[in-house]
Curated annotation (Swiss-Prot):
This is tRNA(Ile2) 2-agmatinylcytidine synthetase TiaS. ATP-dependent agmatine transferase that catalyzes the formation of 2-agmatinylcytidine (agm2C) at the wobble position (C34) of tRNA(Ile2), converting the codon specificity from AUG to AUA. It comes from Haloquadratum walsbyi (strain DSM 16790 / HBSQ001). Its main location: cytoplasm. Gene3D superfamilies: 2.40.50.1010, 3.30.70.2200, 3.90.600.20. Disulfide bonds: none annotated. The keyword Cytoplasm applies. One of its GO terms (biological process) is tRNA wobble cytosine modification.
Amino acid sequence: MTVIGIDDTDSRNRGMCTTYLATRIATAIEHAGGTVERRLLIRLNPAVEHKTRGNAAIALHTDIDPTDAVEISTQFIDSLAISDDPNTSPGVVITDTCTPHSVADSVIDFCWDAIREFHTIADTVDLIEQVGYHHQGWDGGRGRIGALAAVGAWAALTEWTIEHIAYRQFNRCGTDRDVDEKSVFEAAKRQYPAVWDTVDREEDDAVCVPNAPGPILYGIRGDDVAAVKTVAAEIDSEPVERSSTFITNQGTDIHLRPGTIGSLRDNRAYRVTGTVITDPETRPGGHVFVTLGKRETTEEDHIEETSSKESAVLTDTHHLRTKSSNPDITDQNVSSTITCVAFEPTKRFRQWVRKLRVGDIITVCGEVSNGTLKLEKFAIRSLTRTTKTAPICPGCNRTMKSAGRNQGYRCRDCGTSSSTQSEKSLDRVLSLKWYEVPPCARRHIAQPLIRGDFDAPIMPER
């Protein structure tokens, strides 16, 4: 079988989409008498600096002759890839020396590092040539990094979801999309939760319809092929020129790794448990910040930190071997605290962050950037139920005042003194559950709570 990996053919500002280009290649393969058994959409490390938009690479598994695969792929990249954007650097990797299940261990490890770490183009080319794959790059060919990762993905990963993408007539790119949102909401409601992140009901937003320029009309995500296709069929819209169904690692949390405060590194994503040590603070722009401190870890903490999908991933020996391919990219944050932030675009998620209190123990998930963890979801492990307050005078029922540093409290009316504070019960809205950002703010690779397999009750957003 021939495997074609493609990446970095689009542009943040000028449109195109690697999934569209791959779909055109797949159609050409079929017209040439070949078949495409599988189409993979692989989301890579979302913190990578050199990315176009969603940092996705594509792999096509086909029975076409590799020589024909090279000719067809290069033809479409030459004609459709964005060539006038200095940040676009297409690449293709093609192999027929193995099946998608039996790529070299070094390529499997490479895929894991591309999802959680970083690669250089020099190291990538060295590995491609070691394993004997065909490769070609345009404008530096940085896309060969994602292309090689996509080639290794089927052997590396075990959890998959589905995305069915509908494409517009190509001459309509750059114009407003004509999609009847009422039909989107109704179709999404009927197939939820097998289909998720189609709409954001609270924000009244059809999140499956992109705003960026390019050929995608809408993308329907879920866990069931029939369900996502049913939703797509029930959407009223402008003409759909073509469509493609991808198997993908979207919505799986595969980018997260267990971490501990004091050993987190920038531009990686973690699942880490800590104690809230500051009250939440809303800063200009509506962003909400809260700081976590270290706590003594126990075996139970380890179980918590490997919750969600990590327990399944730990069974993969290739994942256990994964390490940074370039450890000098960024320094480790050795601070005993980590600042977490819920940015304004996370909307109603911020209400939960604002309800945290000093002493709460939580597990947070997100990417670390400039020493700050950008919250994607969090779980309450323990809640502070009381707070310390100045004592009430037993004689006159008034609140005592401080008598001075380390001198306790004194009632200014009757002179009664006390050396200790009182405890006041807190009425907590939060409970021992997982909380998440809404669909309108969810990054492609992050797992919606509704997909399940979490270690505590969930508060899914829809």
